[in-house]
């Protein structure tokens, strides 16, 4: 598949500077791109790579400085434009409408004729698979679960009983939707067997709304009662844990190894960077940003940016980190002052 640069510009709404008739055959990073590849440049850190690149065309921001003779495609959002161009060369997987004979489909399950179910997948009683959805090997869709249209379920995904997955959802390998929430009541008697943690039935479900992507080995626990919910357009990275009854608003970004404890609610467009930990029963407002490894122990107001453990306003955290770097020097200065003070005291005590 090839496109002229002018065709690409019309597709993404960019402005060509240079040869619009250039034939583009693929996408590549700046360092590896050749004369018929398109790459992108939006971070000044990679300025030298941009200048040295052999790429036939580079997608840049509107105000980027362009080396002489360089063909570029100016776009208001270079990364987004490049992503759209890359999709043209690497379109989403299309379903091959069939049910593999090695798949296990319960007679009461409803699989749309345009869906694809690959070998060793299993679809349980009363489960529903929507139009054009692709179910890879090893996927288990349990009893009464519903999966919408145009979804992509990669190998070894598990969707537990009665859980709901919307349209255009991507579930990466090994993720689990609707595993039991972590709920136990301590029983000191244990009905004659000694003290024990009595399992609280997790009778609710998990709901994944439209246009969500969930990364590999992420776990979305079902609710104790009601629903755990992942809002429309939210993207969740690998190895994320959402506890029972957590609610994520639309368009959140949850980066790898984040853990969110039960019944916490996140608003719209919240960003949790890697390894953020959030305790249960909190409210995190719209547009909140949480820096990597932050420990969130209280509610966060809409629009705030927080960092550190326990989390504090990001500007305060930066100041505290700057002060922390000065501690070795301050410690030496204090020791010198203490020695000087001791000398002064000794001299004063020795006078008649």
UniProtKB/Swiss-Prot annotation:
Keywords: Acyltransferase, Lipid A biosynthesis, Lipid biosynthesis, Lipid metabolism, Repeat, Transferase
Sections of the chain in a coiled coil: none
Xref: Gene3D superfamilies: Hexapeptide repeat proteins, MurE/MurF, N-terminal domain
InterPro entries: Hexapep, LpxD, Trimer_LpxA-like_sf, UDP_GlcNAc_AcTrfase_non-rep
Associated pathway: Bacterial outer membrane biogenesis; LPS lipid A biosynthesis
EC number: 2.3.1.191
Catalysed conversion reaction: a UDP-3-O-[(3R)-3-hydroxyacyl]-alpha-D-glucosamine + a (3R)-hydroxyacyl-[ACP] = a UDP-2-N,3-O-bis[(3R)-3-hydroxyacyl]-alpha-D-glucosamine + holo-[ACP] + H(+)
GO biological process: lipid A biosynthetic process
Keyword Repeat set for record: yes
Keyword Lipid biosynthesis: yes
GO CC, any one term: membrane
Function: Catalyzes the N-acylation of UDP-3-O-acylglucosamine using 3-hydroxyacyl-ACP as the acyl donor. Is involved in the biosynthesis of lipid A, a phosphorylated glycolipid that anchors the lipopolysaccharide to the outer membrane of the cell.
Family the UniProt entry places it in: Belongs to the transferase hexapeptide repeat family. LpxD subfamily.
Protein name: UDP-3-O-acylglucosamine N-acyltransferase
Gene that produces this protein: lpxD
